[in-house]
Amino acid sequence: MELVLKDAQSALTVSETTFGRDFNEALVHQVVVAYAAGARQGTRAQKTRAEVTGSGKKPWRQKGTGRARSGSIKSPIWRSGGVTFAARPQDHSQKVNKKMYRGALKSILSELVRQDRLIVVEKFSVEAPKTKLLAQKLKDMALEDVLIITGELDENLFLAARNLHKVDVRDATGIDPVSLIAFDKVVMTADAVKQVEEMLA
């Protein structure tokens, strides 16, 4: 199959297995959920009644005071007491096979092509690391919410995009399923397309 280059009167021949396969919604969902789960810190921790600082002495005698019986100031019922089912640090990551991960990326890229959300260009750059230059370039292309993928990370482009809210710049090795579906449009250079094809082959 061929992808038309927007900034040139030509087309780029690409593999149909990478850019023309059927959309596997279940696979994409599984991989995206796993990717998001892997980004969780999982560092939350609370103290049980055994870990809270405080005396082990019984606050008052069992009977005769008229107050409710109590055996410890560290009881979860008490203010500043321990937590009954205390949270523990945990690893939320889920295992995803390479074949599944690549399959999900191919599905997403193919769907982007079908929905006309993937724009392929010969090259994409700015002369200087200026947000104004990139903003004007995107305005000329009628792009606002966009992920730009280049063959190699262009420092000028990267710095120019940092202050734009709905714009991100990645090199071909930095793509992931979440970022591909997070933006309205994806702009890829011809070099990036070839690199992605080789990565997913």
From Swiss-Prot:
Region (Disordered): 44-71
Classification via SUPFAM superfamilies: Ribosomal protein L4
Bilayer-crossing regions: none
InterPro entries given in the database record: Ribosomal_uL4, Ribosomal_uL4-like, Ribosomal_uL4_dom_sf
Gene3D superfamilies: 3.40.1370.10
Known outcome of mutating residue 160 to V: Does not regulate the S10 operon; assembles into ribosomes in vivo
Entry GO terms, CC: cytoplasm; cytosol; cytosolic large ribosomal subunit; large ribosomal subunit
Effect of residue 63 to E: In strain: N282; confers erythromycin resistance. Ribosomes bind erythromycin poorly and have reduced peptidyltransferase activity
Alphabetized GO MF terms: DNA binding; endoribonuclease inhibitor activity; mRNA 5'-UTR binding; RNA-binding transcription regulator activity; rRNA binding; structural constituent of ribosome; translation repressor activity
Keywords: Antibiotic resistance, Repressor, Ribonucleoprotein, Ribosomal protein, RNA-binding, rRNA-binding, Transcription, Transcription regulation, Transcription termination, Translation regulation
Domain of life: Bacteria
HAMAP family for this protein: Ribosomal_uL4_B
Membership in a protein family: Belongs to the universal ribosomal protein uL4 family.
Protein name, entry field: Large ribosomal subunit protein uL4
Originating species: Escherichia coli (strain K12)
Origin organism lineage: Bacteria, Pseudomonadati, Pseudomonadota, Gammaproteobacteria, Enterobacterales
Gene that produces this protein: rplD
